[in-house]
UniProtKB/Swiss-Prot annotation:
Cofactor: FAD; heme b
Function: Integral membrane protein that functions as a NADPH-dependent ferric-chelate reductase, using NADPH from one side of the membrane to reduce a Fe(3+) chelate that is bound on the other side of the membrane. Mediates sequential transmembrane electron transfer from NADPH to FAD and onto heme, and finally to the Fe(3+) chelate. Can also reduce Cu(2+) to Cu(1+).
GO-annotated cellular components: cytosol; early endosome; endosome; endosome membrane; Golgi membrane; plasma membrane; trans-Golgi network transport vesicle
Protein name according to UniProt: Metalloreductase STEAP2
Entry comment describing in which tissues the protein is expressed: Expressed at high levels in prostate and at significantly lower levels in heart, brain, kidney, pancreas, and ovary.
Domain Ferric oxidoreductase: 259-407
Organism of derivation: Homo sapiens
């Protein structure tokens, strides 16, 4: 695979791959690139190549019919003719059609074949499409790449995340050629090494929110539980005790009581994972021991949990702003005014309630502002503009501040009602009491980690210090035998 002398007299790689003795592909206007196939991806790829100054030759089973869908400057011909005109060929056909090129394998000797195909599902075949293509044409230089880019992105030009293309090949020089070609097409190539990485590259476009599944399930489960909890307390209890029908509260009021609890619980889960990781390292006295799989997965999903927390907080704000618009709220307001007049009360001002509501709303706005900052800095383009210290300060320090202010928001909302018997319906605590449990645990755990006796030990562990007991029993050696390459930084 590494040799290209089979094309005739020994030549350098650039002389063999490119026509007319061109060195490299820096002058794209003199390079001919072949595309096997005439589908949507082949059409978009051809347009992209032409815009970047390449000459394109299309190999098709029916060139007369296919030529109607390509620009007139494109040479549309049969497979055999196309393969003889270029040394860099995009194989833009499905896996089941690879064998159609079998009779032309003598024309593919020493040429670069770029496999851009994808499968219908993850791990559909025992080997990747690129490895299968390499087994069919062992004398060709197979490169996997451009399969993560859609035809739409190719035609309109790469933008943002669609600029990245993953490339792998067993031939280093062929891989470098395709990497340079990707740069000429204004993509950002990412070298993933040998062709064994092709299976992972082919699975990338087929994954559907892999890291989001767990957090979404957790969020839905929490929302369902707290919704039913509020429904039983605020709707079923009045009906069972006083035959009072409060079912009208379900669409807005019950939902709005559920949203903030889920939001603050998800935010607590974001930072609880880090506390458990720190406790794990303190317990074993080392940072070289891998976390349990469940904790490792939890740590990887913190961004998704935080964004879901921000989503529930934003929806909570929208619902809260709509509360005064409800017809039921207007009726309640009129009833209160009538009762006040009937009781001959001239002034219903309550200083304590005024201060409570003012502080409650103020803390809510501050927590939402900090959550917005956390959400914005999680955007890749924004986080890439920050150095590590800036990013960790926002996501860690300000994140804990946001959690603390959110906890104050809930505390002031509950005020003294946690100690009043009438709010314990069916002998269950109020919603805000449940909402405070997990944030309080996280804040208390963070305070414990700030203690000098613990923080100093944790810093030593992060710098590589280990307990001798772990080295003797777990590692079976001394510190010089520990390889830094084995460390997994979460």
């Amino acid at each position: 695979m590494e040799s290209i002398s089979m094309m005739g007299s020994p030549k350098s790689l650039s002389e063999t791959f490119l026509p007319n003795g061109i060195n490299g592909i820096k002058d794209a206007r003199k390079v001919t690139v072949g595309v096997i196939g005439s589908g949507d991806f082949a059409k978009s790829l051809t347009i992209r190549l032409i815009r970047c100054g390449y000459h394109v030759v299309i190999g098709s089973r029916n060139p007369k019919f296919a030529s109607e869908f390509f620009p007139h400057v494109v040479d549309v011909t049969h497979h055999e003719d196309a393969l003889t005109k270029t040394n860099i060929i995009f194989v833009a056909i499905h896996r089941e059609h690879y064998t159609s090129l079998w009779d032309l394998r003598h024309l593919l000797v020493g040429k670069i074949l770029i496999d851009v195909s994808n499968n219908m599902r993850i791990n559909q075949y025992p080997e990747s499409n690129a490895e299968y293509l390499a087994s069919l044409f062992p004398d060709s230089l197979i490169v996997k790449g451009f399969n993560v880019v859609s035809a739409w992105a190719l035609q309109l030009g790469p933008k943002d995340a669609s600029r990245q293309v993953y490339i792998c090949s067993n031939n280093i020089q062929a891989r470098q050629q395709v990497i340079e070609l990707a740069r000429q097409l204004n993509f950002i190539p990412i070298d993933l090494g040998s062709l064994s990485s092709a299976r992972e590259i082919e699975n990338l476009p087929l994954r559907l929110f892999t890291l989001w599944r767990g957090p979404v399930v957790v969020a839905i489960s929490l929302a369902t539980f707290f919704f039913l909890y509020s429904f039983v307390r605020d709707v079923i209890h009045p009906y069972a005790r006083n035959q009072q029908s409060d079912f009208y509260k379900i669409p807005i009021e019950i939902v709005n009581k559920t949203l903030p609890i889920v939001a603050i619980t998800l935010l607590s889960l974001v930072y609880l994972a880090g506390l458990l990781a720190a406790a794990y390292q303190l317990y074993y006295g080392t940072k070289y021991r891998r976390f349990p799989p469940w904790l490792e997965t939890w740590l990887q999903c913190r961004k998704q949990l935080g964004l879901l927390s921000f989503f529930f907080a934003m929806v909570h704000v929208a619902y809260s702003l709509c509360l005064p618009m409800r017809r039921s709220e207007r009726y309640l307001f009129l009833n209160m005014a009538y009762q006040q007049v009937h009781a001959n009360i001239e002034n219903s001002w309550n200083e304590e309630e005024v201060w409570r509501i003012e502080m409650y709303i103020s803390f809510g706005i501050m927590s939402l502002g900090l959550l917005s900052l956390l959400a914005v800095t999680s955007i890749p383009s924004v986080s890439n503009a920050l150095n590590w210290r800036e990013f960790s300060f926002i996501q860690s320090t300000l994140g804990y501040v946001a959690l603390l202010i959110s906890t104050f928001h809930v505390l002031i909302y509950g005020w003294k009602r946690a100690f009043e018997e009438e709010y314990y319906r069916f002998y269950t605590p109020p919603n805000f009491v449940l909402a405070l449990v997990l944030p309080s645990i996280v804040i208390l755990g963070k305070i414990i980690l700030f203690l000098p006796c613990i923080s100093r030990k944790l810093k030593r562990i992060k710098k590589g210090w280990e307990k001798s007991q772990f080295l003797e029993e777990g590692m079976g050696g001394t510190i010089p035998h520990v390889s830094p390459e084995r460390v997994t930084v979460m």
